[in-house]
Structures are given as structure tokens and as C-alpha cells.
Design a protein with these regions (language model features):
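Internal, active-site/partner-interface "lid" segment
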Residues: 19-73
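ATP-dependent carboxylate/acyl-activation modules
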Residues: 1-3, 8-12, 22, 56-61, ...
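Short acidic-hydrophobic, aromatic-tinged amphipathic segments that line or gate anion-handling sites
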Residues: 14-18
Length: 300
């Protein structure tokens, strides 16, 4: 209430809700005998209302999604929100203005959820390289979601939002070599994601092939690997915490609306297969088909 009240009276009040504003505000006050310009106070008021709106939307989402009769449950039992509330409020923070969108004539930006799911691409930290583009982020998300679905050491190479090489092996090096051989032509200029710590052996293998990539993603990199990669100043290297947790909901914009669904978290098991052909597949063939089924869900 105090934040809203202060924002309404921005003509004579400066309300600060973002610690990032402290330094520039102090500098302006120092340059203006302790005063802030009206334009600055107006900007702070807009930021304050954005802050309270986000807070209110999170509360509204929670309360709207409560099961009927939730108030009658014991106090110690936390109510469980419904999957699809009657009204949906979304809160995102803009983190980057991108050079352009999917095409060069489109403008674009990247927004991060206020509380992103652990292990999602939005949680990335960039170790080196040029700034990410719209397509870099989209392709990186496709590669990361695919590679983190595997328990065994895995490597996924994505080009134009589709996996062109996916492999698992006893080591990340073996997985990389297999995935590269899947389509060695499309592998160039793509995105590579690993689900384990990348060592110098993997970097050396990439260098031997003169494998040019746009983005390299992994949960971590060894010190030797970081040193070897540092010379590739244009290569974008991202670190993302590994987690197999999926987004609670998936969204797709349509004209004037929003399609919402739960994520495709189904993984077929050999025990659940029904073989209807006269020729029975071998155990290896079944294993290969289960692998293909897991990868197919990430093909656009």
C-alpha cells in the first residue's frame, strides 16, 4: 500500500523498488543538490506499479487456482493450485534486448519468468562469446531440453531448432563423436549441449574436426576446457544447472489467445510395448526404438 501511495504521488515523492537504481539516483541527487527530476520520479513510479502488479498477479494466480473448499482444509495443509486456473496472470522480467528476432527485420527481446523452473535455459550464465541472438536462445532451449532428458552421458546437436545429432555413450566424448557422425554436415554452425561436465578431451575432439558451433552448453566445464575454449572469442559458452524438472505448463500463442498444456513427459518403457508383428524385434532393436522415440518428441 505504501509503495502504491508513493507512486501515485510521484510529483513530490520518489519511490525506489529496485536496488539497481540506487547508484544512478545517488549520482543524480549529488549533481542536483539532493533533488531528483520529475521525469526520474515518474519513471520510478512506473517501475513501482510494475513491481506491485507482478506481486498481485502471483497472488491472484495462487488464489484463483485453489481447489474449491480449500479454506476448509487444515491450516497446516497447503492448498494445491489447479493446473489450469480460470484466469491466468503471467509475470516475466525483461533481461535482454536482442539485436533482432527470427528474421533480421523483426525486433525481439528475452524475458525470464519471475520464478523459472530449475534447470531451464533461462537460468543460463554466459562464460564467454558474443551476445545471444533470438535464434541462439530458441535453439539452445531445444538442445538443452533434449539432452537433459537422458540419464546416460549424452550429446545433442541442434540446427534450426531440430536435433540433427543425438547420442548417448559411457562418456561425453563418445556421445559427442557419435552425435557428430549422425550428420556431420548439419553439425557445423549448430548448437551443442551436454548433460555432464565437459573436459579437455571433448574440446580437443571438436578442435580436431574444426567443428564450428554457435553455442556450447553444459552444466559445467573443467578448468582446462575453459582455457582451451577461451581462444574462441566468438563462441558462446553457456553454463546451465542440470535438472530434469520440466516446466509446469507450456504455452503457444495463437491469434487473440493462448494455448496451454502440460509438458510431454511420457517416456516409453520396453515393458509397456505391445508387439503386433510376426517378426519379433531383438532386444537391441527395441532399445534403439525407445531411444528414437525419446528423441522424436523434440523434432519440430
Amino acid at each position: 500500500a505504501m509503495v502504491r501511495s508513493s507512486a501515485k504521488n510521484y510529483a513530490g515523492v520518489a519511490i525506489v523498488t529496485d536496488p539497481e537504481d540506487y547508484a544512478p539516483l545517488l549520482a543524480e541527487m549529488k549533481a542536483n543538490a539532493g533533488a531528483l527530476q520529475l521525469a526520474t520520479r515518474f519513471g520510478l513510479a512506473k517501475k513501482a506499479f510494475t513491481h506491485t502488479a507482478r506481486y498481485d498477479s502471483m497472488i491472484a494466480n495462487w488464489l484463483t487456482g485453489l481447489d474449491e473448499g480449500a479454506e476448509a482444509k487444515p491450516a497446516e495443509a497447503a492448498p494445491v493450485p489447479a493446473i489450469f486456473p480460470a484466469k491466468l496472470q503471467l509475470a516475466f522480467d525483461r533481461t535482454e534486448i536482442l539485436r533482432y528476432g527470427e528474421n533480421s527485420h523483426q525486433s525481439a527481446a528475452f524475458y525470464r519468468e519471475t520464478n523459472p523452473v530449475a534447470g531451464s535455459i533461462a537460468a543460463y550464465s554466459q562464460l564467454q562469446g558474443k551476445e545471444l541472438s533470438y535464434n541462439n536462445i530458441a535453439d539452445s532451449d531445444a538442445a538443452w531440453e533434449c539432452v537433459k532428458s537422458f540419464d546416460a552421458p549424452a550429446c545433442v546437436i541442434v540446427k534450426h531448432a531440430n536435433p540433427c545429432g543425438v547420442a548417448i555413450d559411457g562418456t561425453l566424448l563418445g556421445a559427442y563423436e557419435k552425435s557428430f557422425k549422425t550428420d556431420s554436415t548439419s553439425a557445423f554452425g549448430g548448437i551443442i549441449a551436454f548433460n555432464g561436465e565437459v573436459g579437455i578431451d571433448v574440446v580437443n575432439a571438436m578442435n580436431e574436426r574444426k567443428h564450428f558451433v554457435e553455442v556450447l552448453i553444459a552444466p559445467s566445464f573443467t578448468a582446462e576446457a575453459k582455457t582451451a575454449l577461451a581462444g574462441k572469442t566468438n563462441l558462446r559458452v553457456l553454463v546451465v544447472p542440470i535438472s530434469r524438472v520440466l516446466n509446469t505448463l507450456e504455452f503457444k500463442r495463437v491469434g487473440g489467445g493462448l494455448l496451454v498444456q502440460t509438458p510431454d513427459d511420457f517416456t516409453a518403457q520396453a515393458s509397456g510395448l505391445k508387439i503386433v508383428t510376426k517378426v519379433q524385434p531383438t532386444a537391441q532393436q527395441i532399445e534403439d526404438l525407445l531411444f528414437a522415440e525419446r528423441v522424436a518428441k523434440f523434432v519440430k
